[in-house]
Every structure is written in structure tokens, then in C-alpha cells.
UniProtKB/Swiss-Prot annotation:
InterPro entries: MtmB_MeTrfase, MtmB_sf. One of its GO terms (biological process) is methylation. This is Monomethylamine methyltransferase MtmB3. It catalyses: Co(I)-[methylamine-specific corrinoid protein] + methylamine + H(+) = methyl-Co(III)-[methylamine-specific corrinoid protein] + NH4(+). Keywords: Methanogenesis, Methyltransferase, Pyrrolysine, Transferase. It holds the Pfam family MtmB. Pathway: One-carbon metabolism; methanogenesis from methylamine. It is an enzyme of class 2 (transferase).
Amino acid sequence: MTFRKSFDCYDFYDRAKVGEKCTLDDWDLMRIPMKAMELKQKYGLDFKGEFIPTDKDMMEKLFKAGFEMLLECGIYCTDTHRIVKYTEDEIWDAINNAQKEFVLGTGRDAVNVRKRSVGDKAKPIVQGGPTGSPISEDVFMPVHMSYALEKEVDTIVNGVMTTVRGKAPVPKSPYEVLAAKTETRLIKNACAMAGRPGMGVOGPETSLSAQGNISADCAGGMTCTDSHEVSQLCELKIDLDAISVIAHYNGNSDIIMDEQMPIFGGYAGGIEETTIVNIATHINSLVMSNASWHLDGPVHIRWGSTNTRETLTIAGWACATISEFTDILSGNQYYPCAGPCTEMCLLEASAQSITDTASGREILSGVASAKGVVTDKTTGMEARMMGEVARATAGVEISEVNVILDKLVALYEKNYASAPAGKTFQECYDVKTVTPTEEYMQVYDGARKKLEDLGLVF
């Protein structure tokens, strides 16, 4: 039987009030892991150690497993403790009508985001920025300007303001509203000072409540040509605050960036199981959010990094499969263990850039150095490396990419527990001129030389 109309966030809200009751523990500890394990066994999924898949039959099985995961599990609403289910036709309607391209930014600084494919020769869009990392108020503009000054960077992804007018942006307070507005206003001023006033941005990142996120759409702040973030919860969950934000974004004709970071070793389980959930999450971004694009970010439960062997495999298989069987536009966000001005940080970011570029990602978003949790530990140099490596990787044979990645990850994977802390932006850059130190340039050249030795041609 055909569906009555295309599914939207208002339908989600209505079903979240009447769906099947379920406890949070039952969802997290039983339904998600059991279904993911069942589907892995049903489809015989085995990635055999490949970062980027070469077996299209296995990719098709993975897509079917991810689709089935979303269809049979649905999405858990954490506010009502009920499950929202979609019909198969509603899911296919969303997939078949995915937004195939869009423009970020304005004027000569605008960039066209278009579908890429596995092994594509075109370089992906580089969304450079702190990626939700905490940034001090006094260096908020210089930090973001360091990205806008890099020609490899196409758009900016915002950092989090630790204070606004010296006060913490407490959720649901006037200071959160002020911070949500100020965040993007300062970043756009930074872009203008770099000679790129039309650069698109992705946020807001500081605000945690619906009113904070919605207030970011304002004069001098977020506009409909910027990426507007809404986050799913791990795994296959959402709250009603986010549904309200989605309603605002759709009603404002905003570009919607639906974000979620599946956790390897968490509720979903192992590599194949987490990838199944990741596929379901990608598809849900269309059904629930009507998203323009989905921002991925598989993260390791122990190391808090997106650059481990396991998380790169999840990202590579998920993106390649989504690219092969849908028109969903996908990005990935970067959280290396090491901090700025270290070779390890640059090599970690490079491994993910290689994976994302080769697997068909449309947008690379980063870099949140030092796992994105240390104040002021992020700079434009890491984004430069992300972009240069993407350019060097585009069009390289997948078999060669897998060999390079295996050797590259081996260079740093034994050092997660003792990853170098690195330096703050203030220690890496001249804050007044917004230029990197001689020390950082030497570190950068050293990392680049190691990548060349592995076979990358810059």
C-alpha cells in the first residue's frame, strides 16, 4: 500500500507520542546490538581488513543490512521513551528524493557540493575549522581566520565559544542565545578579514538547546547558504528538541547538516555491526531531517579518535556503500588523538583524508586535534594537510589506497595511549599576523615527507 504523503519531522513528532514503549536500557543494550549482530550473520558480512571495499556484492549486502536495521528498529525518542517506525515506502521515498547538490556560501567564495563516487578524481570539499572544539573568546577570530587564510579550505566549520562577554554560555540562558549569534558573526568577520567574506560556515556549535540553535539564524549570523547542524544520538536515537530545530531549518529553507558519530565498541558492537548502524543513520538523516547532507564520524570508544584502523574501516565501507547505492551526500569529521604541531596529528588526519577521499566523501570536516576536547588546540595547518592529502589521493586506485593506508596507520597506531599533547594555537601561530611558527612548518614538512615515502604524490 502506498504512503499517504512524504514523511517529515511533524510526522516524527506525532509518532513519537504514540509509538511502542521501550526503556532506554532495552534499546541500548538489547535491541541495537542484537539486531546489528543478527543482520551481520544474516548477510554474512566480513570486511576482510579492507579500509575501502573492493567487493561490490559485499557492499550490496551491507546496504541491505543497513536499510533493514532502520526499517525494523526505527528510531528511539529519548523524551517519550517510544519508538518511531517508518514504512519501507517512506524510506525509499526519502532515498529517491535526496538532494543531489547544493551551494555553500555566496559570491566568488561559494562552492558547489556535488556527488562524488568511489575513486573519484575530483577533490572533495574541505570544510576546515575547529569542528566543535572549545576556543577561547580572545582568540576566537584568529583561530578561525587561520582556516580562512588557507586556499585548500573551501568552507568553515565552527568552534565552540568557551565564554561570551566573559560568561559561560549556559544552555537555555540569555548567554547561550548571545553566544549562538556571536559565534558565527565573529567567524564571518574573520573570513572577511582573510579576504573571503562569502565563505559558508557550518554550525552552530556553541549552543546545546533548541532555542540557542534557532537563534543562530540572525542578521550577520547563519543564513540559508550555511550548513545548519542537527545531531542524532548514539545509536539511532533523537530528542524532541532536535525535532523542533529540524522544523525551524526546513521552514527557513536552510541547508541541513545532519550529524552523528557512531561508536565502535559501543552499543552497536564490532566493525561490521557498527557499519550497519552507520548506514541506517545515513538513511535516517533523509527520512527524519530532510537533510541536505549527513556528517559522519565513526569514533573509537577507548581512544576517542576517528583515525584508528577500526573507525577508518567503518567510515570507508559506509561511505563507499552509501555512494554506490544512493545519492546521499556525505561528510566525515576528524578527531585525531595527538595535538597540533606534532607529526602524529598530521599523519592521523592524513589517514582519514585518504580514506574519505577514496571512498567518495563529498565533504571533509576538520580537524579537531587532541580529540577536540582541549581548549585552543586546533589550527589551520591541520586543515591544510587534510586538503593537500585529499588532492593527492583523488583518482588513486583503491587497491593502492588500501596498501598506503595499512602502512600509514601502522606508523601511529601503537601510540594512542601516549599521543603527544601538542601545542595551543597561541603556541603554534603568531596571533597578530595569523601565521604558523617556523617550528610547525618544519613538523609539517616532516609529515609530508613520510607521506611521500608511502607513495602519495603531492
